[in-house]
């Protein structure tokens, strides 16, 4: 029972240091910009007289354009006149469901490297130290 309590304590310590390491930094306070003096009123610019008007050049009237010729509306083909196409045949070899490879019976043995309690404790301790350095 004692080793389980130590493991729980280490995990809680890891979570606490991780939470402290990821806490947001305090936001910097914004300093107001220095006050600027109000703009000085400038006198309005002196109005200049408009330039003398020049007479517009005379343009000839546009020539009359002939009206476009109308064409009779075309007749749409009936559905009976449209040929129907057959769907394309599939290309390449066909694979039947029975020839699909099944799951292999021989599965690799699980690794025993991560089941060692000393490895778990060492990893937790290293993580705690890493989080403490970052905090």
Swiss-Prot record:
Topology versus the membrane: Lipid-anchor; GPI-anchor
Which residues does the propeptide include? 112-135
What PTM annotation applies here?
O-glycosylated on hydroxyprolines; noncontiguous hydroxylproline residues are glycosylated with arabinogalactan.
> What residue spans carry the region label Disordered?
22-112
Q: Which InterPro entries does the protein's record reference?
A: AGP
Q: Where located?
A: Cell membrane
Record field: compositional bias (Low complexity)? 96-112
Please give the function described in this protein's UniProt entry. Answer: Proteoglycan that seems to be implicated in diverse developmental roles such as differentiation, cell-cell recognition, embryogenesis and programmed cell death.
Similarity comment text for this entry: Belongs to the classical AGP family.
Q: What is this protein called?
A: Classical arabinogalactan protein 4
Q: What is the organism of origin for this protein?
A: Arabidopsis thaliana (Mouse-ear cress)
């Amino acid at each position: 029972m004692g080793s389980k309590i130590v493991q729980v304590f280490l995990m809680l310590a890891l979570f606490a240091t991780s939470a402290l390491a990821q806490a947001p930094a305090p936001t910097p306070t914004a300093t107001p910009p220095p006050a600027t003096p109000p703009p000085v009123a400038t006198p309005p610019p002196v109005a200049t007289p408009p330039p003398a008007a020049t007479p517009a050049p005379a343009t000839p009237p546009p020539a009359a354009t002939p009206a476009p010729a109308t064409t009779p509306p075309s007749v749409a083909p009936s559905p009976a006149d449209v040929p129907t196409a057959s769907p394309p045949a599939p290309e390449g070899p066909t694979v039947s469901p029975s020839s699909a490879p099944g799951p292999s019976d021989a599965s690799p043995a699980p690794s025993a490297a991560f089941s060692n309690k000393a490895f778990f404790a060492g990893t937790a301790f290293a993580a705690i130290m890493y989080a403490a350095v970052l905090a």
